[in-house]
């Protein structure tokens, strides 16, 4: 901060001056040579234009998902609803398809870069996973689907917590 002040550099959040919408900017960026991901969406979402040069971002997005129960697909769906590109119902279906999927490519690069084993990686992530959000077995271990993805306890988008849900003093205490 001191270096920026002494160099008389001021940061400006452009969103204060004009509406920034990454998806609507993609076409213009492509006219300057930008390329989107041609073989499908990036891990953790349904878009193909962000985080193209860094697979490790998918680990950040996954950690957000295991801690808070939503990830980058939810972020993008909210923007798409707000900008009139998607209905709420379409967004729910899209989020359920993409949010929280284990980032296999990103995990592989992470393990190689940090010289970490897969078992240690999962043990550390599981220790920070919010077990109030995800299914656990009788022993308290997280339950995964056949693809290795965590399974959320609640899939009631917009319905709130259903009546059959056992009452707890706090969803954040285990």
Where are these regions (language model features)?
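Nucleotide-activated chemistry modules centered on ATP-dependent adenylation/adenylyltransferase
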Residues: 1-174
